[in-house]
UniProtKB/Swiss-Prot annotation:
Tissue specificity remark: Enriched in cardiac muscle.
Biased composition (Pro residues): 184-200
Protein name as it appears in the record: F-box and leucine-rich protein 22
The organism's taxonomic lineage, starting at the top: Eukaryota, Metazoa, Chordata, Craniata, Vertebrata
GO molecular function: ubiquitin protein ligase activity
Organism: Homo sapiens (Human)
Annotated F-box domain residues: 6-52
Major location category of this protein: cytoplasm
Domain of life: Eukaryota
Annotated Gene Ontology cellular component terms: cytosol; nucleolus; Z disc
Subcellular location: Cytoplasm, Myofibril, Sarcomere, Z line
Subunit structure: Directly interacts with SKP1 and CUL1.
Keywords, in A-Z order: Cytoplasm, Ubl conjugation pathway
Pathway in which the depicted protein is active: Protein modification; protein ubiquitination
Amino acid sequence: MWPLLTMHITQLNRECLLHLFSFLDKDSRKSLARTCSQLHDVFEDPALWSLLHFRSLTELQKDNFLLGPALRSLSICWHSSRVQVCSIEDWLKSAFQRSICSRHESLVNDFLLRVCDRLSAVRSPRRREAPAPSSGTPIAVGPKSPRWGGPDHSEFADLRSGVTGARAAARRGLGSLRAERPSETPPAPGVSWGPPPPGAPVVISVKQEEGKQGRTGRRSHRAAPPCGFARTRVCPPTFPGADAFPQ
């Protein structure tokens, strides 16, 4: 009789540990990651994301998984018994079927947009829906698998490019504003910073003089100082009591 050989879980290589983690639920993954540092490193490995199997789309709303900054590709695959509903053409669906698919689509869209906004390294987020296997055991279904009966939903791969394009446009606009802004230099000694202070109001003195021929009411206007922009600005008009101002 051959002796019974035992192997501890930590003796498995990284690939086997990632495969085991991919089939655990969220509570089991977190509990197993707390046992030792080696399993905790596997739990934080970004490669685990490409192996996860979701039982339903509602798992995407919870903080079940850790997204690392080194994650570059995100492929979400879940197994649904309603894949035959989501994979048919939209014009062939009933109102009830459209309502089901719209909830799926909006949930995944919002989740992927949040992931793209938080992780700048993500390049190609995608989602896939696979038919539920008859045996009840989750299986990984790729885009070329014969069991895959629907489209690859490649339109979700453009989410990252759209977010990246918006960020690039914002950076270009901010850069152009900074380029057009004049460089600010400190003022020279004795020169005040900012616009010049407003000066004294311009007063036009009006006096009455009596001529030799007895004519009264002749007015002599003092020349007013220039206003700076003679063609665009108008000097203030004369008003009663202007002689009371100091000369």
